[in-house]
Amino acid sequence: MKREYDVLVVGGGPGGAFAAKTFAEKGYSVLLTEKRPAIGAPVRCAEGVGKALMHEFFKPEDRWVAAEIEKANIIAPDGFKMELEPEKAGAEVGYVLHRKVFDRDLVWMAAGAGADIQVKTRAVTPIMEDGAVKGAILNQGGIAQEVRAGLTIAADGVESKFARWCGVDTTVPLREMETCAQYLMTGIDIDAHATEFYVGNNIAPGGYVWIFPKGDKTANVGIGVGGDRCKPGNRPIDYLNRFVARNFPNGKTIELIAGGVSICQPLPCTVANNLMIVGDAARVSDPLTGGGIYAALYTGKLAGDVGSKAIEKGDTSTQALMPYDETWRASYLGKALERNYQIKEVFVKLNDDDLNAIVHSVSKMNLSDFNTLNLIKNIIAANPKLAIKLGKAGLKSLLDSF
């Protein structure tokens, strides 16, 4: 490990790996550090990503894909199942990934482009001089080493300690942190090409249960619950255990993971002097679904593109890096995050009668272009009483602006 690089990337997830790859491909010296001993492990993700969004960056390798998803089912609190066939779910179909394989391949791409990689290496303290980040003190195997860099990328996930240590307020209110638990299960009767989502305040208050297939009779079965709704006996794992007991009593659990997903608005600013923040660290996971793979890839690559130009000009100040922040906010990603946050704020307050009405009404719709925006607009049109509630929350006028 050298003592000086053009770029230091803190975090080896998709955002950090794609940023490192982009910088390295442009000829800059890059060090990517990952605090865990292995890239991609442990997995803390449902592993789903939209097909069109993934293809924006590359054609997935076969070894990345656990299952190709052709349709989605949404199950209401009363048990009614709405099936979205491929012709309706076109914008929502995609892949369930093997994240361990996918993440490692992304880091290998970065290494192949010339980036140095160090695992089990923690950035424990940023080097701050005159209000600017100048690198970090890294701890590897109990040995501390100072590594200086002209530009640092904070890609350290939802915890995002590094950005906070650099003076960026990354605090997430409890009500805007989805607490999650997930089993990898086998021996369960599922549709291997359909995702399923269960909603309801007795099933997953402030969130939902998901079933993401990963092969024959195998799936990620997980839950997200609003952080402010967790109580003794009603933790995410408690809700999940009850769900599994009802639906998969003979299933076998292979793995358990737990973690958190921010469902808040993005950070007010994702750059500082010599610092760029990407992926979950920037709070760009989807506040409605919790998905974050696409956002990590997009912001990681964009950081590499904008940051490279700033380095070339010899100016990595906040102002020089601001095009990164402005570009992603003006993009499809930024607009979707804004819209979905407002939708989430309304939907977490709906009772089960409202949720039943929504799922039943959607099942009767003929949506030739199914996506979140069209879905919500059609729900409002089909449910006059619900439209009044959503209108009072300001959601209808927001949707009309998109």
Curated annotation (Swiss-Prot):
GO terms for biological process: glycerophospholipid biosynthetic process; membrane lipid biosynthetic process. It catalyses: a 2,3-bis-O-phytanyl-sn-glycerol 1-phospholipid + 8 oxidized 2[4Fe-4S]-[ferredoxin] = a 2,3-bis-O-(geranylgeranyl)-sn-glycerol 1-phospholipid + 8 reduced 2[4Fe-4S]-[ferredoxin] + 16 H(+); 2,3-bis-O-(phytanyl)-sn-glycerol 1-phosphate + 8 oxidized 2[4Fe-4S]-[ferredoxin] = 2,3-bis-O-(geranylgeranyl)-sn-glycerol 1-phosphate + 8 reduced 2[4Fe-4S]-[ferredoxin] + 16 H(+); a 2,3-bis-O-phytanyl-sn-glycerol 1-phospholipid + 8 A = a 2,3-bis-O-(geranylgeranyl)-sn-glycerol 1-phospholipid + 8 AH2; CDP-2,3-bis-O-(geranylgeranyl)-sn-glycerol + 8 AH2 = CDP-2,3-bis-O-(phytanyl)-sn-glycerol + 8 A. Pathway: Membrane lipid metabolism; glycerophospholipid metabolism. It comes from the Archaea. GO terms for cellular component: membrane. One of its GO terms (molecular function) is oxidoreductase activity, acting on the CH-CH group of donors, NAD or NADP as acceptor. The keyword Disulfide bond does not apply. Belongs to the geranylgeranyl reductase family. DGGGPL reductase subfamily. Is involved in the reduction of 2,3-digeranylgeranylglycerophospholipids (unsaturated archaeols) into 2,3-diphytanylglycerophospholipids (saturated archaeols) in the biosynthesis of archaeal membrane lipids. Catalyzes the formation of archaetidic acid (2,3-di-O-phytanyl-sn-glyceryl phosphate) from 2,3-di-O-geranylgeranylglyceryl phosphate (DGGGP) via the hydrogenation of each double bond of the isoprenoid chains. Reduction reaction proceeds via syn addition of hydrogen for double bonds. NCBIfam families: GG-red-SF (TIGR02032). This is Digeranylgeranylglycerophospholipid reductase. It comes from Methanospirillum hungatei JF-1 (strain ATCC 27890 / DSM 864 / NBRC 100397 / JF-1). The lineage of its organism: Archaea, Methanobacteriati, Methanobacteriota, Stenosarchaea group, Methanomicrobia.
